[in-house]
């Protein structure tokens, strides 16, 4: 199960994700992302307990779309478990990753 809270902060769309991002839930995240119109997005993963390969693919697709539109996407609040997955897959080199939402907002402005 996954819940997503979407807010706006100074022209940046913030998605606060809770639960698991997996093959069942990642289409919901992708759909919500495609509806937003901001050039800057932060995905807060602080309350994400699990992410699988389909979740990673969704985040990479979101990043590619933002870059193609001249925008930026940052991630924040990765747990040790989720951060480890990003490091193993080398995705930590692709994304702007911040320890918390405030730092992520500052980095992508």
Language-model features: locations:
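Charged/polar, solvent-exposed surface patches and flexible loops
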Residues: 31, 103-106
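Acidic phosphotransfer microenvironment of two-component signaling modules
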Residues: 80, 102-103
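STAS-typified acidic loop motif
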Residues: 3-31, 50
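Short hydrophobic/aromatic patches at helix-to-coil boundaries
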Residues: 2-4, 106-109
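A generic structural signal for alpha->beta connector loops
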Residues: 1-3, 11, 70, 94
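Amphipathic alpha-helical interaction surfaces in cytosolic regulatory modules
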Residues: 23-95
């Amino acid at each position: 199960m996954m819940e997503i809270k979407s807010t706006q902060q100074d022209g940046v769309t913030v998605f606060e994700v809770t639960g698991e991002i997996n093959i069942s839930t990642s289409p919901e995240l992708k759909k919500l992302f495609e509806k937003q119109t901001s050039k800057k997005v932060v995905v807060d993963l602080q309350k994400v307990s699990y992410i699988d390969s389909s979740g990673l693919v969704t985040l990479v697709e979101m990043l590619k779309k933002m870059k193609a539109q001249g925008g930026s996407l940052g991630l924040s609040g990765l747990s040790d478990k989720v951060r480890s997955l990003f490091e193993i897959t080398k995705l930590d080199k692709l994304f702007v990753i911040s320890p918390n939402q405030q730092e992520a907002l500052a980095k992508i402005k």
